[in-house]
Amino acid sequence: LLLSAALLFSGMPVGVAKESPPFGLAIHGGAGVIVRAEMTPEAETAYRGALQAALDAGFDLLAKGGTATDAVVAAIKLLEDNPLFNAGKGAVLTHEGICELDASIMDGRERRAGAVAGVRYTRNPIELARAVMDKSPHVMLVGEGAERFADSLGFERVPNDYFQTERRRLQLERARQRDEAAARQAQRGDPSQSSADEFSISDLALDAEHKWGTVGAVALDRSGNLAAGTSTGGMTNKRFGRVGDSPIIGAGNYADNRTCAVSATGHGEYFIRANVAHSIASRMAFAGEPVHTAAQSA
């Protein structure tokens, strides 16, 4: 869970704030699913470089007086374009072997929001989510309807295989094999044996990423406005149009200038059931809790 960038400035002296309005940006590339022992120095360099580039893109906009929303979109767009992350290019695959992408954004000043779910052909879902917020009367558009809206605005369409990578195909194959192993065990009537027993540690480390690979950003601009954004490919081997918390305002994303901005990453079903992002803001607003306490309690 990533908390508000406003927290970074909660202790700043008033005099300093008047001379130089605070601003900041925080990003995440997933909830820490990569096993350090499995990561090569080259891979770590690649991940750190990609995260730094996204951070720099958003931070530079803020430094020049850009809005929090601009910064969030700029940072997330770079993560969507990088195949290392489970968002945009490099997203995980559904059971059918395609990418279905979700994204959302929220402006904390007026609590406006936009989201898309299940899109397959829009290159940068975070930009489409912002368009839903800025250029439609709606909050969420889904599937082909969202794609038609993108077409009406001239968004770039790409074939679905643009998003797909060999690494994600391998993860999908592992997930399918685990499903088949579980089915075999059920037929044998041996629930005591874990399906994981049929796979090596490295197989499981590879498969672990399928649960937590969401990317996101929160920002505070010089005008004191907060924004939050989240983008994801969801879970490997997901079925039946499954949608997690990332595009759901109040669950995986929330921003309110009066409290905080939140971009969540983790098991989406739990974030939805607990309405986590909004709960954090509500505990700050109504219980007077600081952001860290609110996050632990939500």
Region roles according to the model:
Residues S10-K18:
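Signal peptide processing junction and immediate N-terminal pro/mature segment
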Residues L1-G11:
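Bacterial N-terminal signal peptides
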Residues A17-A298:
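Alpha/propeptide regions of enzymes that mature by internal proteolysis
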